[in-house]
């Protein structure tokens, strides 16, 4: 399962961050999650949203479907990252990711 929430209107991928919303200039959306969720959204004619909840209580949302329609998705980059997010394992791999800026989304 690549999403956290699903209803008749949308798919939501939800991340809980240990930083504040303004700690970093951008936030990671992995290409594999993008690909699978956009495929589901298109198949069911619903929207795909990416949400981040930050340590300071703010929740930010990016309307990925709308960003794609407006050709506003950032370019895809390769980034060396932990193989698994919440596993104590120092092994790194290269992942393809989109780096989403706060100004491409909105607070909800």
List each model region and its residues.
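Non-catalytic C-terminal interaction segments of nucleic acid-processing enzymes
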Residues: 38, 46, 53-108
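Conserved catalytic cores of phosphodiester-cleaving nucleases, focusing on short active-site segments
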Residues: 5-21
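General helical secondary-structure elements
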Residues: 11-13, 29, 79, 97
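A generic structural signal for alpha->beta connector loops
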Residues: 8, 45-47
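Beta-rich catalytic cores
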Residues: 1
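Short, conserved, surface-exposed binding loops centered on an aromatic residue
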Residues: 4-6, 40-42
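Structural beta-sheet core signal
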Residues: 11, 50-52
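Mg2+/Mn2+-dependent nuclease catalytic core
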Residues: 17-41
